[in-house]
Amino acid sequence: MMIKMSISRLLFCSSLFLSGISVFAQELPYKQPNLPIEERVNDLLSRMTLEEKVTQIRHIHSWNIFNGQTLDTEKLKAFSKGMSWGFVEGFPLTGANCRKNMQLVQKFMVENTRLGIPVFTVAESLHGSVHEGSVIYPQNVALGSTFSPELAYRKAAMITKDLHAQGMHQVLAPCIDVVRDLRWGRVEESFGEDPILCGLFGIAEVKGYMDNGISPMLKHYGPHGNPLSGLNLASVECGLRDLHEVYLKPFEMVIRNTSVLAVMSTYNSWNRIPNSASHYLLTEVLRNQFGFKGYVYSDWGAIEMLKTLHYTAHNSEEAAMQAFT
């Protein structure tokens, strides 16, 4: 009887303790969905260490945490070091395995990190989700030749069905580069050579994604479609008039006509100044002139290339600082 009574008291006290933890967690402003977003964000930022803030603007690559088609929880635990990361992709995953694995990563981040911040799941989708089993659509250069932005809207809206089924929040599209050199190896990713056409198609695709619950990302910000000798990583050489009336015009159009919140900067350069470390492009033009309020996401390897390709940084730390331009 005494043992039963002790167990009953223990369970009762434990329930009070756990409910107290639950109430405390719910009282944290950043976890209360009924509060204004800005208030929740400010509260969360006030609780974060510098390292946690830095980790929020970093990306987990699939090779960091997956073994083939399976999430390696031990790898994820060692890699994350108790902190939630900003973004994760699973490009090698098939469509059938994608959602399950993304949910496992999300569950880990929410339950096994200090602040429980969810991660943003990211997919590539220039003309259909990159994951095996997804519907593939015509490349942008073919879509642009129809001169029908409505088709771009419908295409993006259809792609979101696959993205939702795969557990994705964000797509690395649309590509609105203006092509002016057919030797460039990425011509098919563009809607064409006309900046207004690229802008109109970009607006349509962004709305197609956003109207259906997926966050799009404009790319590639900075002159990109006319590199020297047609080489992908080479500098684009042009004056201010061509910069603004040709290469940046589609970005200005989309930013002014939609509520897009993500832009990807290129890994090449404009007049030999790296686009991903250009104060003029990223701050003076993108934010101050175009009024962009979202975040800039560097293209694959762009920050490291400040050290290995552009030679503007002596090491990775200096390269990262240059990106905060």
Q: What are these language model-derived features?
A:
Residues 1-27:
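Bacterial Sec-dependent N-terminal signal peptides
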